[in-house]
Design a protein with these regions (language model features):
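Extended substrate/RNA-proximal surfaces in nucleic-acid metabolism proteins
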Residues: 11, 15-24, 80-216
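Histidine-centered catalytic micro-motifs
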Residues: 32-42, 72-73, 191
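Acidic/histidine-rich helix-loop elements
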Residues: 38-50, 194-195
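Hydrophobic faces of well-ordered beta-strands that scaffold small-molecule active sites
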Residues: 33-35, 67, 117-119, 185-187, ...
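Divalent metal-dependent hydrolysis catalytic cores, especially in the metallo-beta-lactamase
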Residues: 55-79, 184-186
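Functional cores that coordinate and move charged inorganic groups
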Residues: 227-229
Length: 229
């Protein structure tokens, strides 16, 4: 998993709490979420033997209210989880489900009743910059795949989960295409590796402004570089 995004730095959990009262704002609920999470569908996923159910259990253990599967240049992780659930439900309806399968299905239902899981992907844009696109769970997976194709991810790599997929789309164009598709657009780890505002970036001020203040960009994920977490 990557950074939790509720106006916090990478690796810091934001507990659910009431926002402090101010003269000009009503009290609002705050939630702990992780909108930058990889799964075994990403080629560089480090852990072996991890099931999608394990990812949901860990999210529940950490007190998260929502997570987004944002694998590299693919929506395959989210698709694989949904397909597993669909298969389990079909076996249940046909009466051919085993006790172990029924237990998994019931666990999925319990967790998904408590946890919002959003589909998305992490695009590798031109010059290696990363951009997240996160969608409503009602969005058809085909729509998300077509968005990847519009971003010039090769059709043959749509399910590969590769971090490098050749020449895709420049950052600002990626923001626009993602927003037009209905995505929440986030620049991940913006001030560190592959981030649009990383230190030592050899671009001018106008480019930095465009990369960080474009109207189609909805949020920046930043990293606390001094933290050991």
């Amino acid at each position: 998993a990557h950074g939790r995004c509720v106006a916090d730095s990478e690796g810091t959990t934001v507990p659910r709490r009431k926002r402090p009262s101010t003269p000009n704002a009503s009290n609002l609920d705050w939630y702990a979420v992780d909108l930058h999470m990889h799964t075994p569908a990403s080629k560089d996923y480090q852990q072996s033997g991890v099931a999608y159910l394990d990812i949901l259990r860990k999210a529940e253990k950490e007190g998260l209210a929502a997570i987004a599967f944002t694998d590299h240049n693919t929506v395959q992780g989210y698709a694989a989880m949904r397909q597993e659930i669909t298969d389990l439900e079909r076996w249940e309806q046909s009466g051919r489900i085993t006790p172990e399968e029924r237990s998994r299905l019931e666990e999925y239902r319990r967790l998904l009743d408590r946890l919002l899981v959003l589909p998305g992907f992490e695009l590798t844009a031109t010059f290696g910059f990363h951009v997240l696109a996160i969608f409503d769970p009602a969005t058809p997976l085909r729509t998300i795949e077509l968005t990847l194709l519009r971003l010039n991810v090769p059709a043959g790599l749509l399910t590969a989960g590769e971090t490098e997929v050749g020449s895709t789309t420049d950052v600002v164009t990626a923001y626009r295409i993602m927003a037009e598709a209905g995505a929440l657009v986030i620049a991940p780890h913006a001030n560190s590796s592959h981030g649009v505002a990383m230190f030592g970036l050899g671009f001018g001020g106008q480019t930095r402004i465009a990369y960080t203040q474009d109207p189609n960009l909805h949020a920046l994920e930043v990293t606390d570089l001094e933290s050991s977490k």
